[in-house]
Amino acid sequence: MGVGAIAAGLFFGVVCLAAGRKFSGASRGQARFALWASLLFLGAYVFRIVLGYTSEGFTTDTDTFKSWAALANSVGFGQIYHQDIFLDYPPGYLYVLALLDKLRLLFGLPMESPAYTLLIKMPSILADMACAGGVLYLSRKRLGDYPALFL
């Protein structure tokens, strides 16, 4: 769980830094919105990290991603599509999976560990948070500050 806590702390720091820069000369209402949005996103991020660590998810997918990551590092990207395996993802995501497997090896995580499963889920978690940020940004223009937070 240490990796998740570090990632959550870094994410919170980046969000607060960005919010502080964006609203440093802004009115009190905008600064309050930035605080509430930061807290909401931090809570959502921590919730996803805790769920990602404690629940296995759909093990067929996560185990497949883990095996693709290990295979990409062992045979290389030039040979991975020539292997006798089921591989229906484009090479772009395989680069991400290979990087995650290198991180697993760097930290010495076993293939079956919940921490590595969380690491495999991290691109989806970050993409989910980015989409939520985009929805907040767009809805804030149409709905206003606080109604957008509830969307």
Question: Where do the PLM segments sit?
Answer:
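Extracytosolic helix-loop segments that constitute the early lumenal/periplasmic catalytic or substrate-binding loops
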Residues: 61-88, 92, 99-110
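Juxtamembrane loop-transmembrane helix junctions in multi-pass integral membrane proteins
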Residues: 28-35, 108-118, 143
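Hydrophobic membrane-targeting alpha-helices
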Residues: 18-22, 49, 99, 103, ...
